[in-house]
Amino acid sequence: MATNITWHPNLTYDERKELRKQDGCTVWLTGLSASGKSTIACALEQLLLQKNLSAYRLDGDNIRFGLNKDLGFSEKDRNENIRRISEVSKLFADSCAVSITSFISPYRVDRDRARDLHKEAGLKFIEIFVDVPLEVAEQRDPKGLYKKAREGVIKEFTGISAPYEAPKAPELHLRTDQKTVEECAAIIYEYLVNEKIIRKHL
């Protein structure tokens, strides 16, 4: 880290919370490709915004068009991908928004580091395992990625030729082959209300 830089203080978290009447947090959606992470993230963001709550979605694919366009899919690059997103999501959470991230984030150690980063800043981190059997994910395969991975066209593909380490104790575990997108978004919303992160809006 450079030594010729200075941290500039601004409004405190509590001051922002009082002004915005909302707590901040990161909702971290993790799971296989085609498990439904992005779809649930979109639905949750819309649900929160419709209730006049501050929320912002960070999507695994979209981020690679800009902030992380220099990264590939090696283990080292995946680590850096999640490190950067952990920092960005923390900034959104610190602004008293609900930061919604939808990333495969296959390695448990990376997700644990993201949690620790938030904990050190006094911010809430909600890990949500978006779970689906591999065969169902392959049947969905909206981008044709599993087919390419099986054919060897895509190397290091999570769930096929690269590992996915499922969460051991996520705050929520959603089976998207058993629940609709709307049901999943509602479950997350109710969790945020019950944990007093947001107030219930009718």
Curated annotation (Swiss-Prot):
Its EC number is 2.7.1.25. GO terms for molecular function: adenylylsulfate kinase activity; ATP binding. Keywords: Amino-acid biosynthesis, ATP-binding, Cysteine biosynthesis, Kinase, Methionine biosynthesis, Nucleotide-binding, Phosphoprotein, Transferase. ATP binds at residues 31-38. The active site is at residue 105. PANTHER family: BIFUNCTIONAL 3'-PHOSPHOADENOSINE 5'-PHOSPHOSULFATE SYNTHASE (PTHR11055), PAPS SYNTHETASE, ISOFORM D (PTHR11055:SF1). This is Adenylyl-sulfate kinase. It comes from Saccharomyces pastorianus. The lineage of its organism: Eukaryota, Fungi, Dikarya, Ascomycota, Saccharomycotina. The gene is MET14.
